Design a protein with these regions (language model features):
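Membrane-interface transmembrane helices that cradle and orient dolichyl/undecaprenyl
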Residues: 105-120
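N-terminal membrane topogenic signal
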Residues: 1-20, 69
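Aromatic- and kink-enriched transmembrane "portal" helix at the membrane-lumen/periplasm boundary
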Residues: 78-96
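Hydrophobic alpha-helical membrane-interfacial segments at the cytosolic entry of transmembrane helices
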Residues: 158-177
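Membrane-interface alpha helices of multi-pass inner-membrane proteins
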Residues: 121-137
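Transmembrane-helix signature of polytopic, membrane-embedded enzymes
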Residues: 64-82
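Transmembrane-helix motifs of polytopic, lipid-linked glycan transferases
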Residues: 50-66
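Hydrophobic transmembrane alpha-helices of multi-pass, membrane-embedded glycosylation machinery
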Residues: 103, 141-153
């Protein structure tokens, strides 16, 4: 039955995954909600659901654009199933945000094989990875993929090796700028993890 539903890319697949993910996410949020939860809590949780749903579409875009699944939606379905198996992800908003940013980085790294605008793609991927590391520290290890992509595709130009460090500098500047605007609350939040 699942093979017949997800064997081809159809709008019905997105509808099934969207409704099921909304149902399971809603059940999880209602089960975890405090009795005195206000509307801000539910708006924040709905925003996280939209980010999770956007992650599904970014993953589907990556797989279809690069021919990774040969025109079917099994990657979309498997991502949804893994979300259900590891339902503790729903409780940690930092992991959801970090996952979305890492998918954006992987999209840029995979598109590096076209050898068009390589410097921009390396910067974007590094930027998203360093930004994801602010939300979930262990995401920093994905920077190894940037250097592997540089080795595989554009290692001859020495400037490509400097670009990830420029992205690190940019994320650091943005972090400290946002931290100063928010009266050092970001730094204390980051250090308390």
């Amino acid at each position: 039955m699942l093979a017949s539903i997800f064997s081809k890319t159809r709008p019905f697949n997105y509808l099934v995954v969207g409704i099921l993910s909304l149902f399971f996410f809603s059940v999880k949020i209602i089960a975890l909600a405090q009795p005195n939860a206000d509307w801000i809590y539910y708006v924040e949780q709905f925003g996280l659901y939209l980010l999770l749903f956007a992650s599904l579409f970014v993953l589907n875009f990556i797989t279809l654009k690069n021919g990774l699944t040969k025109g079917n939606n099994y990657a979309l379905f498997l991502f949804f199933v893994f979300l259900l198996f590891f339902s503790s992800i729903f409780q940690n908003k930092n992991i959801i945000i970090s996952n979305f940013l890492l998918l954006l980085a992987l999209r840029r790294l995979i598109s590096l094989k076209s050898l068009l605008q390589t410097k921009e793609k390396i910067f974007d991927a590094s930027f998203w990875i360093f930004l994801a590391a602010l939300f979930h520290f262990w995401s920093i290890f994905y920077i190894v993929l940037v250097f592997i992509a540089i080795i595989l595709h554009v290692s001859k130009d020495y400037r490509n090796w400097i670009i990830p460090f420029i992205a690190l500098f940019a994320v650091t500047i943005i972090f400290f700028l946002a931290n100063s605007v928010l009266d050092n609350s970001l730094l204390s939040t980051l250090l308390s993890k």
